Amino acid sequence: MAKGFNVAIDGPAGAGKSTVAKKTAEKLGFLYIDTGAMYRAITFAALAEGIDLHDGKALGKLLEKSELRLESSNEGTAVFWNGADITAAIRTNEVNSNVSLVASHREVREGMTAMQQELAKSKNAVLDGRDIGTHVLPDANVKVFLTASVEERARRRHLEQLEKGLPSDFEQLKKDIAKRDELDSTRAIAPLKQAADAQVVDTTSMGIDEVVETILDLVKEHSRQ
């Protein structure tokens, strides 16, 4: 495969994008670019510094003056903010509840998009997010839109939290996911939207390996063209 073969995986919160993207990248020997972790990182940093999350300009300045680094690790992607490892810190309920708001600002979106495009430009990479196929990499070689019911997505997130020893409220998660769907789909800048040329995969009753195999088949199909 030529350099710069990109796989874009989009979908709503809890559809299994990160897990699937990570495994797909592993199987292909591609770089995995965790765009969700990038938005979580700036959300965590803004909360830690007491920055108003409604102030797009202040958030844009925070991103400009900070160093955000992603590194491959055995557990997936390690996230560093100004040299500090914040991989675990960005997965809290507080970050979950605020990341859509932070990501809705044009200043944040533009800064992150430029970073992601730069990372993917010269590499074979798998990226997952909300607007990869429509906005970040509209020319991605393979585009996939993962979806699943709100109930199933909340169940997965609930189990994930419990496995990590974090407190979790299933009913609250359902409400949070439904609210996040609405925020992500209706924001003015790069809303969550299925690309016209994306393959839709409903993961509600599928296992992770099954979803990964479906995507690998799409990549093989594209490579044969």
Curated annotation (Swiss-Prot):
EC code: 2.7.4.25
Domain of life: Bacteria
Primary localisation category: cytoplasm
Pfam family, one: Cytidylate_kin
Record family assignment: Belongs to the cytidylate kinase family. Type 1 subfamily.
InterPro entries for this protein: Cytidylate_kin, Cytidylate_kinase_dom, P-loop_NTPase
UniProt cross-references to Gene3D superfamilies, sorted A to Z: P-loop containing nucleotide triphosphate hydrolases
Subcellular location: Cytoplasm
Any one of the GO BP annotations: pyrimidine nucleotide metabolic process
GO CC terms, sorted: cytosol
Protein name listed in UniProt: Cytidylate kinase
